[in-house]
């Protein structure tokens, strides 16, 4: 009974985690690139 209810809640949490990380990782990378570019220009 507990195993049937767990897989339903697990994919939703995984999808949300993937969406947050998928958006956060490139944003941090982009911010780092902008900061690096400004440091090189200065």
UniProtKB/Swiss-Prot annotation:
Keywords: Chloroplast, Electron transport, Heme, Iron, Membrane, Metal-binding, Photosynthesis, Photosystem II, Plastid, Thylakoid, Transmembrane, Transmembrane helix, Transport. Belongs to the PsbE/PsbF family. It is found in: Plastid, Chloroplast thylakoid membrane. Heme binds at residue 21. With its partner (PsbE) binds heme. PSII binds additional chlorophylls, carotenoids and specific lipids. This is Cytochrome b559 subunit beta. This b-type cytochrome is tightly associated with the reaction center of photosystem II (PSII). PSII is a light-driven water:plastoquinone oxidoreductase that uses light energy to abstract electrons from H(2)O, generating O(2) and a proton gradient subsequently used for ATP formation. It consists of a core antenna complex that captures photons, and an electron transfer chain that converts photonic excitation into a charge separation. Its cofactor is heme b. It comes from Guillardia theta. It is a single-pass membrane protein. GO terms for cellular component: chloroplast thylakoid membrane; photosystem II reaction center. One of its GO terms (molecular function) is heme binding. The chain crosses the membrane at residues 17-33. Heterodimer of an alpha subunit and a beta subunit. PSII is composed of 1 copy each of membrane proteins PsbA, PsbB, PsbC, PsbD, PsbE, PsbF, PsbH, PsbI, PsbJ, PsbK, PsbL, PsbM, PsbT, PsbX, PsbY, PsbZ, Psb30/Ycf12, at least 3 peripheral proteins of the oxygen-evolving complex and a large number of cofactors. It forms dimeric complexes. One of its GO terms (biological process) is photosynthetic electron transport chain.
